[in-house]
């Protein structure tokens, strides 16, 4: 097989100006133009001189291969954007324009507040409907990039007299940004390899399920715009390293600033870019371009990132950012030593080098230890520390482990979200390592680190998806380039690599790159003579079939797995008809219409954002999870018996309690299945009152039937979920009180409340709301009233028994008998 041409190589001159020749040259072209080097190479090969350029104009531009390539590239990118946007609209078509999941409801509520009251009111907004009685300062506790982006688009549309509701802007924001993600991925892959690979990468990321899962219409979450910012920042960084231009580096800093404002995953960037620079230093690939790019990026990016209120001084005071500072100091020391090496003798330089490195390393090490010990540098947060120690969160911080997105990724998830790209991704990585240069070192580090983090946490599959699309596109591009453009390669001799030209242009100012070994023409001919047209056709058809299966899989997964809003459920009958289960919105609307405006609703933290967003009522805890002790108090109330829970609810001024119960319809995401996490979180703060072992049977089982633990059968969560459920018989094959989710008959059917009363139960019993009774004006006496018997039955007592059991009067006064005074005494 012939060596793949390097992506930096200039575009080879084609033999004719037909559209097919332009299409074939697309895989080898980066910028779609013919330079003088290509023409000279063509003449050196003995070919005819290239045709003269056609007259200016549209027809003249399209008559050139570059014109056809530009048109073809634009068309493919437009179709990729259109396909990605269309495939994300299944939820809107099947249901309606609605916000999905949990976190997007808070983002939508914040964006609505921003659009209604302005930016400064948003920054100073104190949300009194969250975390009662504490409240929440929203402006300083969110990444505002998502809200500002949606609010800016809404303002522009209204300025142009295009009346659009802010909800529709939020719903369609992520599908729109998916097209920008495709373009940024195209630009990055083109810088890494060539234009053909970039177009394939753009098509892959437009429809891949790993990215669609967080960017469907209605998923108004930070990741919807953050992946675009991530890819665009990486593209500008690669551009900065290749050119050494301050302009591109400043653009990279601005893109990084937008990324910091949009998502907490910016920590991945501020650790991956320093890792890239550090590895380049280890590989002795230091250059002035790297020095200019990283020094400018770190200083300007650091200052810009600190302008986000939620980030503040974290870039200089947290352990997650210390690697970037260390690499910056190392780069300055390396550059200083490079400066001294040209002005000192070899012996003096070696002495100074070892002495300086020892002192600098010791000073940095002692400084880090001192600053960490004194608390100036904060240690790793629990969420980041759990990336290195996967069992840490489950033992020490159960609230982090309770989130499904923080669970380790299964092998099935990789194939489900990436399909055939999982298999072709290592091939693309091998091609990059085989033809290594500065930017390919970056993509190799990106791939390796993303694979590790995606394996540790399901949520980080999102960071793996872009690099898998890029490397898989490189692999497919090489295969198509070899099996479709073989003849043209043989007629066009290889030209010089642009990296070599860059070295010549800088006249030795840069390091000496290790160039790749090119095959001789005779060796290429021997290799390619064995490839007949049949083999080329078979391989090409196989590749096209794989791509077709990939497209079908992506569409099916998007339609069936990632296009269902969690607030509206759908089920299908045997005849194919669909049933809509709208219990969540039904219950939230009931709360909005039938409760006091200032009513306080207690529920588990999963539903806090939805209650505040749809019901507009005050909640005790929500999905922000910033106060673990407050969440543990709610978990303790749910895990305790009714009397103990009532005291907690009165302390927190709770008016209503909301629980999710799926025993009727078989909904597995209800509160009974989440109950053990409530117990674990409560046990972490109240170990004397709540113990997880009390909720298991002696055999260690968690059961809701008669064999279940008495503590479980009498706790508040169990009673609220199964109240009046023992009277319901779902079908003739199961007894009354049969739980379809856990496939068991409940153990406590005679449930009665003393301090609560049922206020609302949705149509399918999915949402149940209870009202907390006010305390009685006069406490009832627990003891029985005294009963008097007028005619008591007298029992015969013998004298012996009476003497033996003689009673006595407690504290009886003792009178001392006086003596008569005699005459003698006087």
Swiss-Prot record:
The keyword Amino-acid biosynthesis does not apply. A motif (WWDYG motif) lies at residues 604-608. It is a multi-pass membrane protein. It is an enzyme of class 2 (transferase). GO terms for molecular function: dolichyl-diphosphooligosaccharide-protein glycotransferase activity; metal ion binding. Mn(2+) binds at residues 103, 221, 223. Residues 2-41, 193-194, 244-245, 283-287, 342-350, 434-439, 483-526 are cytoplasmic. This is Dolichyl-diphosphooligosaccharide--protein glycosyltransferase subunit STT3B.
């Amino acid at each position: 097989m012939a060596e793949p041409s390097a992506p930096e190589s200039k575009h080879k001159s084609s033999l004719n100006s037909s559209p097919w020749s332009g299409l074939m040259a697309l895989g080898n072209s980066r910028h779609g133009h013919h330079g003088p080097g290509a023409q000279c190479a063509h003449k050196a090969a003995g070919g005819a001189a290239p045709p003269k350029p056609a007259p200016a104009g549209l027809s003249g531009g399209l008559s050139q291969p570059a014109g056809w390539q530009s048109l073809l590239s634009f068309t493919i990118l437009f179709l990729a954007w259109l396909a990605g946007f269309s495939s994300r609209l299944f939820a809107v078509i099947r249901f309606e324009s609605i916000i999905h999941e949990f976190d997007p409801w808070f983002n939508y509520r914040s964006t609505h507040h921003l659009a209604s009251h302005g930016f400064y009111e948003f920054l100073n907004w104190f949300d009194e409907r969250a975390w009662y009685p504490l409240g929440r300062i929203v402006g300083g506790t969110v990444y505002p990039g998502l809200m500002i982006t949606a609010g800016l688009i809404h303002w522009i549309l209204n300025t142009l007299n295009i009346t659009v509701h802010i909800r529709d802007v939020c719903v369609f924001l992520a599908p729109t940004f998916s097209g920008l993600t495709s373009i940024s991925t195209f630009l990055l892959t083109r810088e890494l390899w060539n234009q053909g690979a970039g177009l394939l990468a753009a098509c892959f990321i437009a429809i891949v399920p790993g990215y669609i899962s967080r960017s469907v219409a209605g998923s108004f979450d930070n990741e919807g715009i953050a992946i675009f910012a991530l890819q665009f920042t990486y593209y500008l960084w690669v551009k900065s390293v290749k050119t050494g231009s301050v302009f591109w580096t400043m653009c990279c800093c601005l893109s990084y600033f937008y990324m910091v404002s949009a998502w907490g995953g910016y920590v991945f960037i501020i650790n991956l870019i320093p890792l890239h620079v550090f590895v380049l230093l280890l590989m002795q690939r230091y250059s002035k371009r790297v020095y200019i790019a990283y020094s400018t990026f770190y200083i300007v990016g650091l200052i810009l990132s600190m302008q986000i209120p939620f980030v503040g001084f974290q870039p200089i005071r947290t352990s997650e950012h210390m690697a970037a500072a260390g690499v910056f100091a190392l780069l300055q020391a390396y550059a200083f030593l490079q400066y001294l090496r040209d002005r000192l003798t070899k012996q003096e330089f070696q002495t100074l080098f070892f002495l300086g490195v020892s002192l600098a390393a010791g000073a940095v090490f002692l400084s880090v230890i001192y600053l960490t010990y004194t608390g100036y540098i904060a240690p790793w947060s629990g969420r980041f520390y759990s990336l290195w120690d996967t069992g840490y969160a489950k033992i020490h911080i159960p609230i982090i482990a309770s989130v499904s997105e923080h669970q380790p990724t299964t092998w099935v998830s990789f194939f489900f979200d990436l399909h055939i790209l999982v298999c072709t991704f290592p091939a693309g990585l091998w091609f990059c390592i085989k033809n290594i240069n500065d930017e390919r070192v970056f993509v190799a580090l990106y791939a390796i680190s993303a694979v590790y983090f995606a394996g540790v946490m399901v949520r980080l599959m999102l960071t793996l998806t872009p690099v898998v699309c890029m490397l898989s596109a490189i692999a497919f591009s090489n295969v198509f380039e070899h099996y479709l453009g073989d003849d043209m390669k043989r007629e066009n001799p290889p030209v010089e690599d642009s990296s070599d030209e860059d070295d010549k242009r800088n006249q030795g100012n840069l390091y000496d790159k290790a160039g790749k070994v090119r095959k001789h023409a005779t060796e290429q001919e021997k290799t390619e003579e064995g490839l007949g047209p049949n083999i080329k056709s078979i391989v090409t058809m196989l590749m096209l079939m794989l791509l077709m299966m990939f497209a079908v899989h992506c569409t099916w997964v998007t339609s069936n797995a990632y296009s269902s809003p969690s607030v509206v459920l759908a089920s299908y009958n045997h005849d194919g008809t669909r049933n809509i289960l709208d219990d969540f919105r039904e219950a939230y609307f009931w709360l909005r219409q039938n409760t006091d405006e200032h009513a306080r609703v207690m529920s588990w933290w999963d539903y806090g954002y939805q209650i505040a967003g749809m019901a507009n009522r005050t909640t005790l805890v929500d999905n922000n999870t910033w106060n673990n002790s407050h969440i543990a108090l709610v978990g303790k109330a749910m895990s305790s018996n009714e009397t103990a829970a009532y005291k907690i609810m009165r302390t927190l001024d709770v008016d209503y309690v909301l629980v999710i119960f799926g025993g009727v319809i078989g909904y597995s995401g209800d509160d009974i299945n989440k109950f053990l996490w409530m117990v674990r979180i409560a046990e972490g703060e109240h170990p004397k009152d709540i113990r997880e072992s009390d909720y298991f049977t002696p055999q260690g089982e968690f059961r809701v039937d008669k064999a279940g633990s008495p503590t479980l059968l009498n706790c508040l969560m169990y009673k609220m979920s199964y109240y009046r459920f023992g009277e319901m018989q779902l079908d003739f094959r199961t007894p009354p009180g049969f739980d379809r989710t856990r496939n068991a008959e409940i153990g406590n059917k005679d449930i009665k409340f003393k301090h609560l009363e049922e206020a609302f139960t949705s149509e399918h019993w999915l949402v149940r709301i209870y009202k907390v009774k006010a305390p009685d004006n006069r406490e009832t006496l627990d003891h029985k009233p005294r009963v008097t018997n007028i005619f008591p039955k007298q029992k015969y007592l013998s004298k012996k028994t009476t003497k033996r059991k003689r009673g006595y009067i407690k504290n009886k006064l003792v009178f001392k008998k006086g003596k008569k005074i005699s005459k003698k005494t006087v």
